[in-house]
Amino acid sequence: MSDTLNRLAEVLEERKQAAPDSSYVASLYHKGLNKILEKLGEESVETIIAAKDAAVSKDYSDVIYETADLWFHSLVMLSALGQHPQAVLDELERRFGLSGHDEKAAREPSA
């Protein structure tokens, strides 16, 4: 796993025990999963808007910035649910080389 992701996962776990007024992440954990999901939704919309703007302007700095926010808040959500980022990387690895159509068919119940 990326060293950056691993370090971030460690910090996120540490923030679970921190006082809510000590950090942004600690305050999110204190407010609960619904607040974390609300933030994740906001970041999703901001990323979509930045991508639409980048497609026209060809300036990708905002879409990179917003994607980083989206990934960050996704990691906060996973941590709040007791999941490590490695689980997502493992799932991506599992899918590597697998046709998207085949993967989708494997998830669908047979008729």
Swiss-Prot record:
As for family, the record states: Belongs to the PRA-PH family.
Superkingdom of source: Bacteria
Q: What PANTHER family does UniProt report for this protein, alphabetically?
A: HISTIDINE BIOSYNTHESIS BIFUNCTIONAL PROTEIN, HISTIDINE BIOSYNTHESIS BIFUNCTIONAL PROTEIN HISIE
Matches recorded under CDD domains: NTP-PPase_HisIE_like
For this protein, the record's InterPro entries field holds: HisE (IPR008179), PRib-ATP_PPHydrolase-like (IPR021130)
Give the keywords, sorted: Amino-acid biosynthesis, ATP-binding, Cytoplasm, Histidine biosynthesis, Hydrolase, Nucleotide-binding
Under catalytic activity, the entry for this protein gives: 1-(5-phospho-beta-D-ribosyl)-ATP + H2O = 1-(5-phospho-beta-D-ribosyl)-5'-AMP + diphosphate + H(+)
- Which Gene3D superfamilies would you find in this protein's record? MazG-like
ATP-binding as UniProt keyword = yes
Cystine links in this protein are: none
User: Which compartments does it reside in?
Assistant: Cytoplasm
Keyword ATP-binding present in the record's keywords: the answer is yes
- Gene Ontology BP annotations: L-histidine biosynthetic process
- Per UniProt, what is one Pfam family of this protein? PRA-PH
What's the source species for this entry?
Pseudomonas putida (strain W619)
The record's GO CC annotations read: cytoplasm
The name this protein carries in UniProt is Phosphoribosyl-ATP pyrophosphatase
Pathway annotation from the record: Amino-acid biosynthesis; L-histidine biosynthesis; L-histidine from 5-phospho-alpha-D-ribose 1-diphosphate: step 2/9
Q: EC number(s) for this protein? A: 3.6.1.31
What molecular function does GO assign, one term?
phosphoribosyl-ATP diphosphatase activity
